[in-house]
């Protein structure tokens, strides 16, 4: 049973193991709101997951520890379990979906855990972990549907109240619901007036779907850049806690998540993974009313592959009007390309990529299409460049 005493016990157990992460003021992210970021992306292993994993490990019996542990994860729980097992001298086997970022896979191995890659998503890794548990006798460490794990995550709430006792609202990412269950239970127990907002990826709204339907329905599929919260079904324990203590759940798109990752990098010099940035995305795009409030966004993790990061940055630039691609119909004659680039330069745009295609089906046989990528200041700047091109007779293709 989850109790506030258990959360305090977890805090004691984590002393000297998990960092007390900073709550950083972020005035530029959400004007009109006194917004703070709880930087669990700077936690040991790069996410909050060490808290729950380590506390769970301390609650195991000697017999369970001797058998070794097995866990399944989208990546961050894997690292938390691997490091916790290493610190306690326990064998750990981790089942990861084969689409997990390479950085998370390699980090898990670096802590000494045995990694088993499973085809599919988190739920497939979960089934494989249960199979190996039954075959080998390992102790299974659930990533979210476990009282001890939830209590460990709840220690974040104790720190938030210590750092910002006057906080009005807290925004928390949701995957399976372990993080928000621990935070919501603890905050509502100690300060019932606080508003708790859960944030899910639009492509993986398992908790929102379950609460709206009043049952633990399993999503047929999930698709999001926020791999850490790409979960098809919440747990029964997290479902019950969220139904009692969470005020509202909202969703954010992949484009909004990308914009949030970019904003965190530019304004706060922080790197967040997709799952870690959903709370900030909800604040940025006004998914909940935070005007005049003191609010905290839990940035739950920062383990993102640099290859994914580059794609996310490009997506974020497009979302914020800092980049655009124009398709321009040209006559196939000398000087046309020069004319286009000169107009763009005169308007202060910067060309980063050009593709010149000869006549294609449906176009003028004497024409060609120019696909050009620009760096711009904002959406108004893009419209200014488009208008200048059209005034000089160039035709833009939608």
Predicted regions and their residues:
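PLP-dependent amino-acid enzyme catalytic core
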Residues: 1-398
């Amino acid at each position: 049973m989850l109790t506030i005493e258990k959360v305090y016990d977890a805090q004691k157990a984590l002393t000297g193991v998990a960092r007390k992460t900073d709550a950083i003021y972020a005035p530029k992210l959400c004007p009109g709101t006194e917004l703070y970021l709880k930087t669990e992306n700077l936690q040991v292993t790069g996410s909050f997951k060490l808290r729950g994993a380590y506390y769970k490990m301390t609650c195991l019996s000697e017999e369970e520890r001797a058998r070794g542990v097995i866990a399944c994860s989208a990546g961050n729980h894997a690292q938390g379990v691997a490091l916790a097992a290493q610190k306690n001298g326990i064998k750990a086997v981790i089942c990861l979906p084969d689409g997990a970022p390479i950085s998370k896979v390699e980090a898990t191995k670096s802590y000494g855990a045995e990694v088993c890659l499973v085809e599919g998503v988190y739920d497939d890794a979960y089934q494989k972990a249960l199979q190996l548990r039954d075959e080998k006798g390992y102790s299974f460490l659930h990533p979210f549907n476990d009282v001890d794990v939830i209590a460990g995550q709840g220690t974040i709430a104790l720190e938030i109240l210590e750092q910002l006792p006057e906080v009005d609202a807290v925004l928390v990412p949701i995957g399976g619901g372990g993080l928000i269950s621990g935070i919501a239970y603890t905050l509502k127990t100690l300060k019932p007036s606080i508003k708790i907002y859960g944030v899910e990826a639009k492509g993986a709204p398992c908790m929102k779907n379950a609460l709206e339907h009043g049952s633990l329905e399993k999503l047929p599929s999930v698709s999001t850049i926020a791999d850490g919260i790409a979960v098809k079904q919440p747990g029964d324990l997290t479902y019950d806690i969220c139904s009692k203590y969470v005020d509202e759940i909202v969703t954010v798109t992949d484009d909004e998540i990308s914009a949030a990752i970019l904003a965190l990098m530019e304004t706060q010099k922080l790197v967040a993974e997709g799952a870690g940035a959903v709370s900030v995305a909800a604040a940025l795009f006004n998914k909940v009313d935070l005007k005049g409030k003191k609010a905290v966004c839990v940035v739950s993790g920062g383990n993102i592959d640099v290859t994914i990061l580059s794609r996310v940055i490009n997506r974020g630039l497009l979302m914020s009007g800092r980049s655009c691609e124009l398709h321009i119909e040209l006559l196939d004659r000398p000087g046309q390309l020069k004319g286009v680039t000169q107009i763009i330069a005169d308007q202060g745009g910067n060309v980063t990529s050009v593709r010149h295609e000869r006549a294609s089906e449906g176009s003028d046989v004497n024409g060609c299409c120019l696909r050009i990528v620009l760096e711009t200041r904002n959406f108004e700047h893009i419209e200014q460049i488009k208008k200048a091109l059209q005034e000089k007779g160039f035709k833009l293709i939608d």
